[in-house]
Amino acid sequence: MAFVLSLLMALVLVSYGPGGSLGCYLSQRLMLDARENLKLLEPMNRLSPHSCLQDRKDFGLPQEMVEGDQLQKDQAFPVLYEMLQQTFNLFHTEHSSAAWDTTLLEQLCTGLQQQLEDLDTCRGQVMGEEDSELGNMDPIVTVKKYFQGIYDYLQEKGYSDCAWEIVRVEMMRALTVSTTLQKRLTKMGGDLNSP
């Protein structure tokens, strides 16, 4: 019994210590999930993107905000979380269910949900009481406007197959940017609790 208690105490100390692996660290698993989600989007196309060129639109992906030095470390995590949450919301709708192969769509939504759950472990620790303030943070507002533009576009186009194909390609870009942001966070130290 004493051995088990000692083992549990050691695990707790390691988990919350500066080198703890159970703290808010961006894991390899998160990066693997991101790559897998990108791979799932590729075969979801029903049409050739070339057949939908007339429906192309620049949605204003905030790529320069994410890839440049505009985001501070304390802003990067909420932006990453918001991008993944909005991507999940987009593909977890009745309209998207009608547009895509159900199996691939379910796998994509499961992968996005897994990424969000992994990040959610850190979210409370990183965002804490500031959560309500972060909803009004300029980068978050920019991400929300970006996705609102996508929703508006789909509605304007009547959720057509070409509109969904354009959005699929755009979401591949968005997930690539999210992956870049995850890499930046890892380079910033990976520990989302450190200043």
Swiss-Prot record:
<dbReference type="InterPro" id="IPR000471">
    <property type="entry name" value="Interferon_alpha/beta/delta"/>
</dbReference>
<dbReference type="Pfam" id="PF00143">
    <property type="entry name" value="Interferon"/>
</dbReference>
<feature type="disulfide bond">
    <location>
        <begin position="52"/>
        <end position="162"/>
    </location>
</feature>
<dbReference type="GO" id="GO:0051607">
    <property type="term" value="P:defense response to virus"/>
</dbReference>
<feature type="disulfide bond">
    <location>
        <begin position="24"/>
        <end position="122"/>
    </location>
</feature>
<dbReference type="GO" id="GO:0005126">
    <property type="term" value="F:cytokine receptor binding"/>
</dbReference>
<comment type="similarity">
    <text>Belongs to the alpha/beta interferon family. IFN-alphaII subfamily.</text>
</comment>
<comment type="function">
    <text>Paracrine hormone primarily responsible for maternal recognition of pregnancy. Interacts with endometrial receptors, probably type I interferon receptors, and blocks estrogen receptor expression, preventing the estrogen-induced increase in oxytocin receptor expression in the endometrium. This results in the suppression of the pulsatile endometrial release of the luteolytic hormone prostaglandin F2-alpha, hindering the regression of the corpus luteum (luteolysis) and therefore a return to ovarian cyclicity.</text>
</comment>
<keyword id="KW-0051">Antiviral defense</keyword>
<dbReference type="GO" id="GO:0005179">
    <property type="term" value="F:hormone activity"/>
</dbReference>
<keyword id="KW-0964">Secreted</keyword>
<dbReference type="GO" id="GO:0007565">
    <property type="term" value="P:female pregnancy"/>
</dbReference>
<dbReference type="GO" id="GO:0005615">
    <property type="term" value="C:extracellular space"/>
</dbReference>
<keyword id="KW-0732">Signal</keyword>
<dbReference type="GO" id="GO:0005125">
    <property type="term" value="F:cytokine activity"/>
</dbReference>
<protein>
    <recommendedName>
        <fullName>Interferon tau-9</fullName>
    </recommendedName>
</protein>
<keyword id="KW-1015">Disulfide bond</keyword>
<keyword id="KW-0372">Hormone</keyword>
<keyword id="KW-0202">Cytokine</keyword>
<keyword id="KW-0635">Pregnancy</keyword>
<feature type="signal peptide">
    <location>
        <begin position="1"/>
        <end position="23"/>
    </location>
</feature>
<dbReference type="InterPro" id="IPR009079">
    <property type="entry name" value="4_helix_cytokine-like_core"/>
</dbReference>
